[in-house]
């Protein structure tokens, strides 16, 4: 909990500071429906995001996923992921529709309780149909409540257990989604970029956000390492792995843009930051793993 907490709390402080710099040095960053505090908190939380699916794939490629070190990192990232989406839900609260949002949360809680009792009693094939209906219903109702359908989709997955589904079919389903839907998502994402404030301004903002994201995550994890007395170099390795942004960051930024909390220019800067963050991770981490082989053996 110490590591997860510091890895979650420190990066938003760095990111919020970067957002304040953006507000003071230029215009065109805050969306039409966004308050300055929503922009600052949203950008701050964006700097704390860890792309859990991409992190899993990277650690699998590095052959540390199923080692104790990999499982620790996965646990840290999972706890942060839940907290970040919770904060996003608060950012998106619409006080004009707070009644709907309260109704959604109450209905979701009751339905989640019923679903968790129902699913273990269903046949394996029926669980797939029920889970897809559950996903669609949560996304639709979250959007109706003024949150976002992606928030609903995330909440729908939180209450499902992987043990309810056959791993082979889950892998096939994931591969199908990645093959069919992800190219369309990235195409639509690319079409939403905007350079009206100027390429230099966007790239400058992206560099500032990248610095805040990496420095914030490393600072938080290094502080945890000092408290927990980790071996030298261990905090840097874990910090670099936890700062990977990739797909989840892009989804996060899309939600902020859909709700007009940020502009297309801010979205473009966040997108550039996410790409740079992801591209940097593997080249930085591989030499660290080689240098820290004795530490890994001790941890394993």
List where the protein language model places each region:
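Transmembrane alpha-helices that form the ion-translocation and gating core
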Residues: 2-62, 189-274, 279-293
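Membrane-interface alpha-helices at helix entry/exit sites of multi-pass transporters
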Residues: 2-3, 65-81, 86-87, 168-172, ...
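Alpha-helical membrane-inserting segments
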Residues: 14-22, 26, 83, 87, ...
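Alpha-helical transmembrane bundle and helix-membrane interface signal
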Residues: 26-29, 56-106
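Membrane-interface junctions of multi-pass transporters
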Residues: 118-208, 230
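Short, highly charged, low-complexity non-transmembrane loops/tails of multi-pass membrane proteins
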Residues: 292-300
